[in-house]
Amino acid sequence: MSRLQIQLKLAASRIEILRQKEEALAKQARRNVALGLKSYSPALAKARIEPLIMQDIYIELLELLQVDVEILANRCVVLEKRAFNDSMSFKSSLYHVMAAAPQLQIKELRFVHDFLVKLYGKEFARLSDPDLATNDTAFYQLLYPPIPKDELVEAYRKELIRTYFPNDYPKEANKDIPSSAEADTMLNLESSENREQPTSLKEENTQEDDEKVNGNLANISKRAEPQNNGSTNASSLQSSNYLPTNPTLTHSNKAPSFEELAARLDRLKHL
């Protein structure tokens, strides 16, 4: 194992320790700021939240550098043979390390930077200049983060409230959402009880009622009329109370009225 590879592995371990330390500090800082958000003024809350955002960006930068350093440690043989060129698949990792080494207080990274500059020459040092090496804009935004915008600060504040005060978050997040009754009023919706039935449904209900009445009348007439046998005369049927006593109805071919059918039904009940 060469000296360059040893320094790269030590740099990866140092970055991991530094990242874990920053994560613990950021967690404590977020908790302290979240507990004071209810009493802070908007300007003070913004001033307290901006450092938290910058710290999160720094942690993300350390995570990226840790991966890049481990990749370079596995490709150390190529670097030492001066076989590196722009067509290498790990060139972005080398650019990241060369640009971040002068900005971070990690001596192992500084050693890797100085070693590669001496090995490849002074032209290789231009990779550490963000104005000249513009191959990865997203990385340089992590290395030189801009001032957080107001929208980002407000979103971070809401996230803190949601994390540390979950009972207060729904009230703030859903304050503009109307209730179900208000939504019905806004949409002019009628309840199912007050809603008028369509005309076709009314006609169907009326037709069903008429059919039920006609069916009841037919049943009454069947129960009231006698069974006509050839050997049965009118006198025997009248004596057995199957026919009415009114002689005008005995030989009538007309259909009985509703009152007549009702009278027959009453007589049948008394049998």
Curated annotation (Swiss-Prot):
Q: What function does this protein fulfil? A: Involved in a late step in sorting of cargo proteins of the multivesicular body (MVB) for incorporation into intralumenal vesicles. The lumenal sequestrated membrane proteins are targeted into the vacuole after fusion of the endosome with the vacuole.
Q: Which organism is it from?
A: Schizosaccharomyces pombe (strain 972 / ATCC 24843) (Fission yeast)
- Report the locations given in the UniProt record: Cytoplasm; Nucleus; Golgi apparatus; Endosome
Q: Which InterPro entries match?
A: Ist1, IST1-like
Chain intervals for the UniProt region annotation (Disordered): 189-255
Polar residues bias located where?
Answer: 226-255
Is Nucleus set as a keyword in this record? yes
PANTHER family from the UniProt entry:
IST1 FAMILY MEMBER, IST1 HOMOLOG
The record's family statement is:
Belongs to the IST1 family.
Give GO cellular component annotations, separated by semicolons. cytosol; endosome; Golgi apparatus; mitotic spindle pole body attachment site; nucleus
Basic and acidic residues compositional bias: what residue ranges? 192-205
| Keywords in alphabetical order | Cytoplasm, Endosome, Golgi apparatus, Nucleus
Q: What is this protein called?
A: Vacuolar protein sorting-associated protein ist1
**One biological process GO term for this chain?**
protein localization
